[in-house]
Swiss-Prot record:
A family per Pfam: 2Fe-2S_thioredx
Alphabetized GO MF terms: 2 iron, 2 sulfur cluster binding; metal ion binding; NADH dehydrogenase activity; quinone binding
NCBIfam families per the UniProt record, alphabetical: nuoE_fam, PRK07539.1-5
Obligatory cofactor(s): [2Fe-2S] cluster
Top-level taxon in the UniProt lineage: Bacteria
Binding positions for [2Fe-2S] cluster per the UniProt entry: 88, 93, 129, 133
Record keywords, A-Z: 2Fe-2S, Iron, Iron-sulfur, Metal-binding, NAD, Quinone, Translocase
Organism: Rickettsia felis (strain ATCC VR-1525 / URRWXCal2)
Protein name, as recorded: NADH-quinone oxidoreductase subunit E
Length: 167
C-alpha cells in the first residue's frame, strides 16, 4: 500500500522506541500508541494513509489496523476542530444534566452534535463513559477532563477555549 503519511523525525523515533517495548513477535501490540501518535501528528484525526502507514510499520494487514481505529472512540476518522468537545451522555452524566451541557454547547457554538464550527475551532461529539461518574456530568476537551459541570461552568469553558486562554 502506498501512503501519503509518514511520521516526522521526532515521532518516528518515538514510534521506534514504543515498538521496542514489545517482543519482536508481538509488535502489533503497539497499534494503540502508534495510532494515537499518528492522530496527534495529523491534527487530531486519522486519515486512511495514516492507518495504512501504521499497519505497514507493524507488519499487519490494513484491515486489522482499521478495525482498531474504528472500535475505539478516541480515534477520529474525520477532521475535528482545534478543540474537540466530547460530552459524556451515559446514564450517570445524563442524570446529572449532560443534556443541558450539550444544549449549552450547541447554543454557544452555533452547531449541532457531530458538527464543526465554520472556523474549524470546535467539534462537538458525544462520548461513552469517561470513567468519572462520581463527578458527573463530565466533558473531555482534547486531553483534558472537566467534571461537576454546570451550564455556567460550561459557558465559561467555551469562552476560555474560544479565546485560546488569552484572557
Amino acid at each position: 500500500m502506498s501512503t501519503n503519511f509518514t511520521f516526522d523525525k521526532k515521532n518516528l523515533n518515538l514510534a521506534e522506541d514504543i515498538i521496542k517495548k514489545y517482543p519482536p513477535h508481538g509488535k502489533r501490540s503497539a497499534i494503540l500508541p502508534l495510532l494515537d501518535l499518528a492522530q496527534r501528528q495529523n491534527g487530531g484525526w486519522l486519515p486512511v494513509p495514516a492507518i495504512e502507514y501504521v499497519a505497514n510499520m507493524l507488519e499487519m494487514p490494513y484491515m486489522r489496523a482499521y478495525e482498531v481505529a474504528t472500535f475505539y472512540s478516541m480515534f477520529n476518522l474525520k477532521r475535528v476542530g482545534k478543540y474537540h468537545i466530547q460530552v459524556c451522555t451515559t446514564t450517570p452524566c445524563w442524570l446529572h444534566g449532560s443534556d443541558d451541557i450539550m444544549k449549552i454547547c450547541e447554543k454557544k457554538l452555533g452547531i449541532k452534535l457531530k458538527e464543526t464550527t465554520e472556523d474549524q475551532k470546535f467539534t462537538l461529539s458525544e462520548i461513552e463513559c469517561l470513567g468519572a461518574c462520581v463527578n458527573a456530568p463530565v466533558v473531555q476537551i482534547n486531553d483534558d477532563y472537566y467534571e461537576d459541570l454546570t451550564e455556567e461552568k460550561m459557558e465559561k469553558l467555551i469562552d476560555e477555549y474560544s479565546n485560546d486562554f488569552k484572557n
